[in-house]
Amino acid sequence: MAAALCLAPAAHAQQLTATELSAGAATVLARRSFIGGELGFARRPSGQSRVALTVAGGTAANRPAARVQMTWQFLVSPAARRGTGLYAGLGAAYAARRASPGAGFLAVVLGLEAAPGRARGPQNWYVELGLAGGVRVAAGWRLRWFPSWWSTR
């Protein structure tokens, strides 16, 4: 019992966490379709979860527009340094357009990313398909920062 209590903090300390930045393009196909660029920040607080915030600026119905989306995501293979990783998420989105009232939406996302366990590289792409006030499609690149112990594995 005493050994289990001593090992519990060590096991938790080795849990894979990460901080991520992303940049890409997004479009939402809806009655007033949106197209623009997006920047994202995400934190993986534990093994297979990620909390992601994306902010996009562009146009909708020929007017300046912005979108914000926050999702909690489940990563199927978060430590994979090769291949692709699948993830799914649920959250909320807000869309605003000049001279129009803003609107909030439920956000559902399904994504595919290259090597979710690799920190950096030109191959760290992602693509997403989801629903958030219309059909949302996004693609871009991610930079990741992992704990120092991860780079030595």
Regions found by a protein language model. Give the residues of each.
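Outer-membrane beta-barrel "beta-signal"
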Residues: 68-70, 108-110, 134-153
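Bacterial N-terminal signal peptides
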Residues: 1-8
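Short glycine/proline- and aromatic-enriched beta-strand/turn motifs that initiate or cap beta-hairpins
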Residues: 12-63, 74, 144-153
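Solvent-exposed loop/turn segments connecting transmembrane beta-strands
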Residues: 24-36, 57-66, 96-104, 127-139
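Short, surface-exposed connector motifs at secondary-structure boundaries
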Residues: 16, 117-125
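Residue-level detector of the transmembrane beta-barrel scaffold of outer-membrane proteins
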Residues: 20-22, 50-54, 85-89, 124-128, ...
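Gram-negative (and chloroplast) outer-membrane scaffold detector with strong preference
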Residues: 38-119
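Intrinsic low-complexity/disordered segments
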Residues: 9-12, 70
